[in-house]
């Protein structure tokens, strides 16, 4: 069968501080027309660098290709090709879905305009035709109220909705090759399944080829034709998906296949209540009259009750837009809400300044989008140690650095990352920095917002075991928000299921996963790619 993309002897080096780092080390692969090839491997293995090189999106001036390196799309050599050729390929014949939508979408433009623009440029549609097509695309990727959301700015959408906007934008021009770099990272399981099925349908309809970058081996098994396993810049094993899953040869491939989470958490429900929310209600204004008075609200969270116990993990699941993140922000005290929120015996809505400072140390958060939450102008050491400067100012420099290095080692980052910057790390490594920043203060409660979504499966298991170990050793409580039900099942003692701003079901992890009572919970479990 014809090959739409051929990569031969690809070597990519990065120059930094008078040193050279080899990110991709002499790899070769090919993608057949109408087929899906997945690249899997740990964070930093070279997957995303390989993907970015296809569209020549690596930073100029720091990247070097060997003279033997070749990337051919159909008959066009991409490395060092004219800008005119690249412009004709990017977003038209080749589209890419990036891992972190908040850094890819223009924050100053409405999402509908951003999709319209690519249709007008590449498909020569009128503004009216482009808008009709855009709304149709939003419907396909299951954006609620597409006619209204088309006029939203990126920050007004949930993380999952922003990812779906990126997918719609990539599919707008019906590309011949779609490069998908962790495209479902921020999505709940039902939308993940629907979007992957949508990609498969479009692939069949248009004969589109897909290069899939992922750490989720369940997705690879279900939606890929071939797979290449990468480690330290090299392809260590490749072949048909069935052959790799049924009879892996390389020890690293075997390790990956054995690292898929799924073990049930042991129950721990006898501890005292650390945080309680009673009748938590959150409304957002969505319309004003000519006098500026709010006349319509979106009731994002509706009279919710929630309890988190010391030393236990509470899971919070539901589709994008269900109210999970809004509820979590209210529990953090950064979202205005009605009702009562009691943390460690105190109402957080009535804390004075010193009590608020203590509360902020005791309640840390690991954000969903690590790149968006890490300052690009600070080193990793400065980022991880920032909380120590605020909450433990008496520490001398050597003591502070010792704690920082220990936290980095706890999340499997080498101490050499201390002086590096976020852009020098992979998505998974940046997420581990975010986790290190949270655990370094040894808080009582950590909000885990998709804590392992950017991590490959082997590192994911290490982080999950690390979190449980820290919980046992330090008596930590976790509130875990995730679309990955395998992670929720592994970590959680008690689980709440949210839909349309309300709790539709709650119970122990064992009861909820083994004997769900509500139809929506059953739908979520059925949609999980396990």
Model-derived regions, located:
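Conserved ABC transporter NBD signature motif
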Residues: 64-77, 339-347
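ABC ATPase NBD coupling module
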Residues: 64, 78-95, 121, 243-248, ...
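Conserved ABC ATPase "signature" region
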Residues: 129-148, 398-416
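A short, proline-enriched helix->beta-strand linker immediately N-terminal to the Walker B motif
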Residues: 172-176, 440-444
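A short, surface-exposed alpha-helical micro-motif characterized by mixed small hydrophobic
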Residues: 220-222, 488-490
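Conserved ABC ATPase signature
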Residues: 152-157, 161, 421-425, 429
